[in-house]
């Protein structure tokens, strides 16, 4: 599991991108239109007096397949759940499990103690604990 602390502000849409509340949804800057398809796994994001905690359901992965990026005001979690074929040719009657790259972008309200951030992947769940710098 790769974990990086970054001291720059996060730019969600990238350079040159504009966010419009109204207007033609098909007219977007080229880098956004050409982005690879990503999915978003189920997530619980909770806050207590002393910390923020994120729990993500992503079974079938290893710690090395996650990248956790901690920006000044956003936590970004990326990964790539690989497709594991059974080897036999088959037709699907139902296919609800998502595979491939995923990305979560979660805002961080307030200051956190970056030296005490921890992450653990266990039994199909990735849990990230973000202790508050000044707990209330």
Please provide the spans of the model-predicted regions.
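Short coil/loop residues immediately preceding or within conserved phosphate-binding loops
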Residues: 40, 103, 114
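N-terminal leader/pre-domain low-complexity segments
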Residues: 1-53, 78, 83-87
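Surface-exposed coil/turn segments at beta-strand junctions on protein surfaces, enriched
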Residues: 47, 97-99, 112, 121
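Beta-rich strand-turn-strand
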Residues: 62-67, 107-136
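Short, well-ordered beta-strand segments enriched in hydrophobic/aromatic residues
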Residues: 52-58, 127-130
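Core FKBP-type peptidyl-prolyl cis-trans isomerase
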Residues: 62-90
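Structural motif
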Residues: 48-50, 71, 122
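An anionic, turn-rich surface loop/hairpin at beta-sheet edges
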Residues: 81-105
């Amino acid at each position: 599991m790769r974990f990086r602390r970054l001291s720059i502000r996060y730019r969600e849409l990238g350079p040159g991108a504009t966010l419009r509340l109204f207007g033609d949804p098909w007219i977007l800057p080229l880098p956004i239109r050409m982005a690879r398809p990503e999915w978003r796994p189920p997530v619980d994001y909770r806050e207590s007096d002393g910390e923020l905690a994120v729990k993500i359901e992503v079974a079938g992965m290893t710690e090395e397949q996650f990248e956790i990026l901690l920006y000044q005001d956003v936590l970004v979690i990326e990964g790539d759940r690989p497709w594991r074929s059974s080897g036999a040719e088959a037709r699907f009657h139902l296919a609800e499990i998502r595979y491939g790259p995923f990305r979560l972008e979660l805002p961080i309200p307030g200051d956190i103690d970056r030296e005490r951030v921890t992450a653990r992947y266990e039994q199909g769940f990735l849990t990230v604990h973000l202790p508050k710098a000044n707990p209330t």
